[in-house]
């Protein structure tokens, strides 16, 4: 799944750590070996870009 994660990261314009692959669809994702297939999986919702983590500013504001 390394290749799929790398392709998805480049398509979603984010890092590999931000890419979430659906654990229930591992067989489907592992068959995808092109950018076109990755694009289809993103559209279907099997591959998602994780949201940004927001760091609390409460300690800075004190």
Swiss-Prot record:
Gene3D superfamilies: 1.10.1650.10
Keyword Transport: no
A Pfam family per the record: Ribosomal_L19e
UniProt record, GO biological process: translation
Entry superkingdom: Eukaryota
Molecular-function GO terms, alphabetical: RNA binding; structural constituent of ribosome
Keywords: Ribonucleoprotein, Ribosomal protein
GO cellular component term, pick one: cytosolic large ribosomal subunit
Ribonucleoprotein among keywords: yes
Family: Belongs to the eukaryotic ribosomal protein eL19 family.
Name used for this protein in its record: Large ribosomal subunit protein eL19
Lineage: Eukaryota, Viridiplantae, Streptophyta, Embryophyta, Tracheophyta
């Amino acid at each position: 799944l390394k290749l799929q994660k790398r392709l998805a990261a480049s398509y979603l314009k984010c890092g590999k750590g931000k890419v979430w692959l659906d654990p229930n669809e591992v067989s489907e994702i592992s068959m995808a070996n092109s950018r076109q297939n990755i694009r289809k999986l993103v559209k279907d919702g099997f591959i998602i870009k994780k949201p940004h983590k927001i760091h609390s500013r409460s300690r800075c504001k004190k």
